[in-house]
Amino acid sequence: MIKKESKKEQRLRRHRRVRKKVFGTPERPRLCVFRSNKHIYAQIIDDTIGHTLVSASTLDPELREKLQKTWNVEAAKEVGLLIGKRALEKGIKKVVFDRGGYKYHGRVKALADGAREAGLEF
């Protein structure tokens, strides 16, 4: 009997396939996105040492006050702006975008656009 793969399993397979090619260096760290039903998270990671350099999410106190809903496109754009601002404060200008196996559409695209508006290059 053939079993259908769940959407989560398909996303994880896509993510593993992409992670073989996308690697964050100290000069160009990886901007990683995770999306849940209620929140969106972004991290900038240096894969050579395995450290998170900067992070932002809809759970951050400064965004919680501003946002009414944490699961929509506007919230994702705010997270992108925040992570871009924090990255520039740390001296990070260029990153490699890792969409985490998600389609580049909706909340993931809004986060990327917000990060670009804040000044990140990818």
From Swiss-Prot:
Q: Which GO terms describe its biological process?
A: translation
**InterPro entries given in the database record:** Ribosomal_uL18_bac-type (IPR004389), Ribosomal_uL18_bac/euk (IPR005484)
Its domain of life reads Bacteria
Q: Name one GO molecular function term.
A: structural constituent of ribosome
* Gene Ontology CC terms, in alphabetical order: cytosolic large ribosomal subunit
Key words, A-Z = Ribonucleoprotein, Ribosomal protein, RNA-binding, rRNA-binding
Purpose: This is one of the proteins that bind and probably mediate the attachment of the 5S RNA into the large ribosomal subunit, where it forms part of the central protuberance.
Q: How does it assemble?
A: Part of the 50S ribosomal subunit; part of the 5S rRNA/L5/L18/L25 subcomplex. Contacts the 5S and 23S rRNAs.
UniProt lists the family membership as follows: Belongs to the universal ribosomal protein uL18 family.
Q: What is this protein called?
A: Large ribosomal subunit protein uL18
Say which species the protein is native to: Thermotoga maritima (strain ATCC 43589 / DSM 3109 / JCM 10099 / NBRC 100826 / MSB8)
The organism's taxonomy opens as: Bacteria, Thermotogati, Thermotogota, Thermotogae, Thermotogales
- Which gene underlies this protein? rplR
